[in-house]
Amino acid sequence: MGRRREVLALAAGWVVTRGAGSAWATTGVGQVLSSTGLADVVRGNAVIALAAGDAVYAEDIVRTGPDSRLQIVCNDGLQIVVGAGTELALRSYLTSASDGRLEVLLGLLRGIARLIGGASPTPRTVEIDTRTAVASVRSTEWLIESTDKGTGVLAIQGEVTVLGLAGGRVVLEPGQGTDVAPGAAPRTPVTWGQARRLDAIARTTI
């Protein structure tokens, strides 16, 4: 997994650093604002139930049940809504030593998540990898879903850059989405139909 993270990060032009090197690795990168149903976190060798008010840390893997949703508010204002049946790895949450930019690295192992880039005291870059793609943004609202059929990404506000692990790159404008099948490049951006867009947003609303 470490080598895969390096390849993904370098493809997006990032410097790879470990969550353990940040003070937030011990104080938490944010907390659970609200939740419905059962959710837990894999932290080291432990599995811990999550509820509103609980802290989350770098290198946690957040998991939701089939009828559960979870909203996380990070220390810098970034909001993450985790949909049902999802596993989301909080790989690292660090400030770059070179330019002071906050670099957030996440991994969507399966399921769906929506990210809302709230006001941040420092510039922020967010990157999420899946089994078929890596998506990155500066400050925007967007969602991403990972299934056995591949990855779907929708830009709600702002631009989202999507790289296929098999090659190819697209930039999504607001309202546009793309799909990345296993072993394929990202499809040409298109405006998602109302039914698909509203369904994805509804599944990431709590």
Please place each PLM-identified region on the residue numbering.
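N-terminal secretory signal peptides
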Residues: 1-2, 10-18
